[in-house]
Amino acid sequence: MGQKVNPIGMRLQVNRTWDSRWYADDKDYGNLLLEDLKIRDFIKKEAKQAGVSRVVIERPHKKCRVTIYAARPGVIIGKKGADIETLRKKLANFTGSELHLNIVEVRKPELDAQLVAESIAQQLERRVSFRRAMKRAVQNAMRMGALGIRVNVSGRLGGAEIARTEWYREGRVPLHTLRADIDYALSEASTPYGIIGVKVWIFKGEIMEHDPQARDRRATEAQDGPSPRGPRRDRDRDAR
């Protein structure tokens, strides 16, 4: 089961939650869902150079809150915040309501599956050897602290007549373990020989608490820095 389904969808409400967090009646649901798709597509095109990883959309009462996770937030913010204000006004045209825009920096893009997949896809479009691109991504992820990573590329690799699939893995990637914090992403490289699909799985550890917000909370704590308090068992051992 875990080998076939999307790892993110399998772990929803276990250690991860949705990227669209709102509730609507049946008559409004379709329109709001279409708005979300348009907002995400627009941000991906406008902030292509910023390395956008995720776009989280929340809709409190008659408002819209958009949070962009990006590797280079300065590209979105611009000089003295001019570009982010322009982007906010353009996004407000999609919703027709008050819109709040937040930018969150991705401190370790080597551990973000979406950014890794897009990086490999861009290298393939520049005709870099797929084996070199895969191996470089795996080495960078393991160096930055990943417990395991798997990269899968499929298509007419190297311009071959027959499409095939190649994959490379290092460490462990437990797809059946629900408490495993596994980041997954898919990207596509457009080459003269056709489309090459790139899939990336990154295993970052285990989240023991049963909390859908646990993954987002862990990301926030990683950006704020380590807690000044040590592990409880270390304090108990020192006391003894």
From Swiss-Prot:
One of its GO terms (biological process) is translation. Keywords: Ribonucleoprotein, Ribosomal protein, RNA-binding, rRNA-binding. Residues 212-221, 231-240 have a biased composition (Basic and acidic residues). It holds the Pfam family Ribosomal_S3_C. It comes from the Bacteria. CDD domains: KH-II_30S_S3. Residues 212-240 are annotated as: Disordered. GO terms for molecular function: mRNA binding; rRNA binding; structural constituent of ribosome. InterPro entries: KH_dom (IPR004087), KH_dom-like_a/b (IPR015946), KH_dom_type_2 (IPR004044), KH_sf_prok-type (IPR009019), Ribosomal_S3_C_sf (IPR036419), Ribosomal_uS3_bac-typ (IPR005704), Ribosomal_uS3_C (IPR001351), Ribosomal_uS3_CS (IPR018280). Residues 39-107 form the KH type-2 domain. GO terms for cellular component: cytosolic small ribosomal subunit. Belongs to the universal ribosomal protein uS3 family. Binds the lower part of the 30S subunit head. Binds mRNA in the 70S ribosome, positioning it for translation. HAMAP family: Ribosomal_uS3_B. Part of the 30S ribosomal subunit. Forms a tight complex with proteins S10 and S14. This is Small ribosomal subunit protein uS3. The gene is rpsC.
